[in-house]
């Protein structure tokens, strides 16, 4: 069991590295930019499972009648851990998206010439389709709101990956 410590440390380091790599994403990040980092996360998680299971079977080897209990508990922990982990990370992502969204929107005012220009350019994209200038302005505002939400989501996912890295390091 002492020799199993190193694979656990390596797997946690791989997961932390992959998470840190993904925590600097932007709206320009594409799937091909995530291949290496997601491989590190997936491989690290899989590599973590083997030594953990071997460490858990240590007590089963000394008392074989605990095999069924171990198998059931291991399965329950895997399923509940996956569900609870996904739920907690999803909740964290939503909370962080709301935070980032409020921070972004707080700085958007139509009195700012850059914001007004962005709204106008967003509305001008519909110039050939929508004749009403008020409706085009509304479409420009909606376009800006969509961009702000997208940026807030990217920042929130960056926060999620940084949280995963921190958990892996601890």
Language-model features, listed with the residues they occupy:
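C-terminal module of multi-pass small-molecule transporters
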Residues: 1-109, 169
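Hydrophobic transmembrane architecture of multi-pass small-molecule transporters
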Residues: 73-170
